[in-house]
C-alpha cells in the first residue's frame, strides 16, 4: 500500500514537470547545421532550431554534452514528437534573474539599443526594459550616442512579468557607485586647482564634465579666449580633459570649470602690443547687424562697428563690405582692457574723402554737383568722393527767405555753390548758393553813408516800427521811439503799404543786416530842387515829401 502510494506520488510529480510550459533539464545530443538535438528524458529527442542557441554575436554558446534548461512546448505535436524551446527557457531564466536583482537591489547588465517617447529601450538578456530619460544619468542627458551599444549596469526599479513591464535606472547605479568616491572628491576640491575629467554631455551653453562622481559645468565662455559659437568646436563627448576649478559651492555641490584659464591670458598688457593707431591684419570671425568681429591674434577679437566700415555710408550692412573668414586690414581705435573690448576701424585704412576735400577745397572755392536730397533745413549736394555738402536754407538767397527760395530747386538738379566751411573731423561741408553773387547789403552799405537822405518803399508797419525796402535784398527800419517829437498814431494814419517815402540813414547794423532809418521831413527853408537832384526823385514821386510833412505837422499840433 505504501509502495503504491509513493509510486503514484512520484508519477504525479513527473506529470507536473512534464506539463506544457514547464522548464525541464536536457542534454545536447548533437548539433546539426540547422538544429540542435536535445534529450530531455521524454519519449523522444527533440529538435530545436540552432538560432535559439546563438548569442548576440551570432555564435553558438553550447556544445555536445552540455546540460541546459528548455521549456516544454508540447509532449505530442500530432507527429509523435516532443516540442522544446531553448528561447523560452532563456526568457524564463532572464525573468528569474531580474526578480532576484529587484528583490536584493542588485545591478543587472544591459545595452541601450533605441529611443522611445520619454526615454530609451534597454536589452536585458532577452528582456526589453524601459529607461526613463531622467534616469540615464545624475544630470539631464540629451544625447546618448556615447552610451549606446555598450554593456552598462542598471538597477531594476519596477517589475511586472504579467504585463511584460520592466523599468530600469542607470542613475541609481551611478549615485550608488559615486557615493563614497564623491564624498572623497568633494573634500579635496578647491578653487584654483587643476583636475582631470571626462566630457559627458554638451549643451548650447557649455559642457558637463565628470570629475569622478561630481559633475562640473564648463561654460562656453570659459572654453577658450576666442569666440566660441558651440562647445563642440572645442570638446566632444568622451574627451578626457584637464580643467581648472573656478568656483566651488560645496553646499549646493556646484562646480564651475575653466579650460582657457589653463593658458596665458592674451589680454594681459594688450595695449602695449597694440597701441592706438597701429595697422593690423585680421580674420573676420562673425557678422552682426551692428558690425563685424575681427580676430587679430589667437583668443583676441575686436569689433569694427558699422559706423567705422565706410566713410560715406554710415548705415551699410556689414555683409556688403566683408564676409566671414576674409582677411582685412584694420586700425586700432581704442582698447578697454578692463572690459576686454577693442574698437577697430576698417575705413581708416582707406583715404578719408572728407580730409581730402578739406585739403583741396578752401573757403570760397566754387563746386558743383547734383542735388541728392532736400530737407526742412536745406539742400544736400553730392560732391566728388561720394560725400555730401549742405546748403542751409539761410544760404540759398540774399533776397527772399530760405523757405521760399528752396521751392525753386528739386532733386537731381545740377547746381553750383561756394565752399563756406569744411569740418573734416565732424564730416561736414557747408556750402552757399547766394554767395555766388555779391551781398546786396554790403554793396548798398558801401555806396551809402551815415546821414544820407534816401528814398524807400514802405513794406510793412505797426505801432512801433516801419519796415522800408531800400533795394533788392536790403531793408531798413524806422522806430517811432527814435522820433520823440512825433505822435506815432498820427503818422500811422497817413502811412500806406508801397508808398515811397523820404528817409535818413541813422546807422548800419551789419550783424543783423538792417539799416536803421529816421523820417526826413522838408521844412520851408529846404530847397526841394537841390534835394531832388541829390536823391534822383522822379517828378511823379514829388508829392511824397509833402504828404509826410503834413503828417508830421499834424502830429506836432496834437502835442
UniProtKB/Swiss-Prot annotation:
Keyword Transmembrane among UniProt keywords = no
Instruction: Tell me one GO molecular function of this protein.
Output: structural constituent of ribosome
Q: GO terms for CC?
A: cytosolic small ribosomal subunit
Query: Keywords in UniProt for this one?
Result: Repeat, Ribonucleoprotein, Ribosomal protein, RNA-binding
Summarize the protein's role: Binds mRNA; thus facilitating recognition of the initiation point. It is needed to translate mRNA with a short Shine-Dalgarno (SD) purine-rich sequence.
| InterPro entries found in the cross-reference section | NA-bd_OB-fold (IPR012340), Ribos_protein_bS1-like (IPR050437), Ribosomal_bS1 (IPR000110), Ribosomal_protein_S1-like (IPR035104), S1_domain (IPR003029)
- GO BP term, pick one: translation
Q: Write down what this protein is called.
A: Small ribosomal subunit protein bS1
Q: What is the lineage of its organism?
A: Bacteria, Pseudomonadati, Pseudomonadota, Gammaproteobacteria, Enterobacterales
Give the record's family classification. Answer: Belongs to the bacterial ribosomal protein bS1 family.
Q: Does the keyword Repeat apply?
A: yes
Every copy of the S1 motif domain together lies at 21-87, 105-171, 192-260, 277-347, 364-434, 451-520
Protein species of origin? Buchnera aphidicola subsp. Schizaphis graminum (strain Sg)
- PANTHER family xref list: 30S RIBOSOMAL PROTEIN S1 (PTHR10724), SMALL RIBOSOMAL SUBUNIT PROTEIN BS1C (PTHR10724:SF7)
Quote the PROSITE patterns the UniProt record gives: S1 (PS50126)
Amino acid at each position: 500500500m505504501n509502495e503504491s502510494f509513493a509510486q503514484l506520488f512520484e508519477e504525479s510529480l513527473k506529470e507536473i514537470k512534464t506539463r506544457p510550459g514547464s522548464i525541464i533539464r536536457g542534454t545536447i545530443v548533437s548539433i546539426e547545421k540547422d538544429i540542435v538535438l536535445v534529450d530531455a528524458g521524454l519519449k523522444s529527442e527533440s529538435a530545436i532550431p540552432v538560432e535559439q542557441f546563438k548569442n548576440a554575436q551570432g555564435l553558438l554558446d553550447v556544445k555536445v554534452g552540455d546540460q541546459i534548461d528548455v521549456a516544454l512546448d508540447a509532449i505530442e505535436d500530432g507527429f509523435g514528437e516532443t516540442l522544446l524551446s531553448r528561447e523560452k527557457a532563456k526568457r524564463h531564466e532572464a525573468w528569474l534573474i531580474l526578480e532576484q536583482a529587484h528583490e536584493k537591489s542588485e545591478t543587472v547588465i544591459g545595452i541601450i539599443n533605441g529611443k522611445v517617447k520619454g526615454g530609451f529601450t534597454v536589452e536585458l538578456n532577452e528582456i526589453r526594459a524601459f529607461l526613463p530619460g531622467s534616469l540615464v544619468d545624475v544630470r539631464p542627458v540629451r544625447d546618448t550616442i556615447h552610451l549606446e551599444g555598450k554593456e552598462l549596469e542598471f538597477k531594476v526599479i519596477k517589475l511586472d512579468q504579467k504585463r511584460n513591464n520592466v523599468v530600469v535606472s542607470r542613475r541609481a547605479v551611478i549615485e550608488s557607485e559615486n557615493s563614497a568616491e564623491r564624498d572623497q572628491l568633494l573634500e579635496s576640491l578647491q578653487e584654483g586647482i587643476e583636475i582631470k575629467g571626462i566630457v559627458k554631455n554638451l549643451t548650447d551653453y557649455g559642457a558637463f564634465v565628470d570629475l569622478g562622481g561630481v559633475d562640473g559645468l564648463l561654460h562656453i565662455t570659459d572654453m577658450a579666449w576666442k569666440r566660441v559659437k558651440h562647445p563642440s568646436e572645442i570638446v566632444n563627448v568622451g574627451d578626457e580633459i584637464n580643467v581648472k576649478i573656478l568656483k566651488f559651492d560645496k553646499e549646493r555641490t556646484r562646480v564651475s570649470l575653466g579650460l582657457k584659464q589653463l593658458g596665458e591670458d592674451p589680454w594681459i598688457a594688450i595695449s602695449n602690443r597694440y597701441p592706438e593707431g597701429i595697422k593690423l591684419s585680421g580674420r573676420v570671425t562673425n557678422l552682426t547687424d551692428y558690425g563685424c568681429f575681427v580676430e587679430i591674434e589667437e583668443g583676441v577679437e575686436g569689433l569694427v562697428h558699422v559706423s567705422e566700415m565706410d566713410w560715406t555710408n554710415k548705415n551699410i550692412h556689414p555683409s556688403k563690405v566683408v564676409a566671414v573668414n576674409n582677411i582685412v586690414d584694420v586700425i586700432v581705435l581704442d582698447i578697454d582692457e578692463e572690459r576686454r573690448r577693442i574698437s577697430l576701424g576698417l575705413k581708416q585704412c582707406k583715404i578719408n574723402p572728407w580730409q581730402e576735400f578739406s585739403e583741396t577745397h578752401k573757403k570760397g572755392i566754387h563746386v558743383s554737383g547734383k542735388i541728392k536730397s532736400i530737407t526742412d533745413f536745406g539742400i544736400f549736394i553730392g560732391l566728388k568722393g561720394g560725400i555730401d555738402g549742405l546748403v542751409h536754407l539761410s544760404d540759398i538767397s540774399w533776397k527772399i527767405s530760405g523757405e521760399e527760395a528752396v521751392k525753386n530747386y528739386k532733386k537731381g538738379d545740377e547746381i553750383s555753390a561756394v565752399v563756406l566751411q569744411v569740418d573734416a573731423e565732424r564730416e561736414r561741408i557747408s556750402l552757399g548758393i547766394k554767395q555766388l553773387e555779391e551781398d546786396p547789403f554790403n554793396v548798398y552799405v558801401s555806396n551809402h553813408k551815415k546821414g544820407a537822405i534816401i528814398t524807400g518803399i514802405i513794406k510793412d508797419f505797426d505801432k512801433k516800427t516801419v519796415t522800408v525796402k531800400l533795394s533788392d535784398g536790403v531793408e531798413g527800419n524806422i522806430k517811432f521811439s527814435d522820433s520823440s517829437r512825433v505822435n506815432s498814431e498820427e503818422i500811422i494814419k497817413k502811412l500806406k503799404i508801397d508808398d515811397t517815402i523820404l528817409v535818413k540813414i541813422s546807422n548800419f547794423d551789419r550783424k543783423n543786416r538792417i539799416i536803421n532809418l529816421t523820417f526826413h521831413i522838408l521844412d520851408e527853408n529846404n530847397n526841394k530842387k537841390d534835394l531832388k537832384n541829390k536823391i534822383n526823385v522822379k517828378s511823379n514821386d514829388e508829392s511824397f515829401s509833402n504828404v509826410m510833412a503834413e503828417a508830421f505837422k499834424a502830429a506836432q499840433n496834437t502835442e
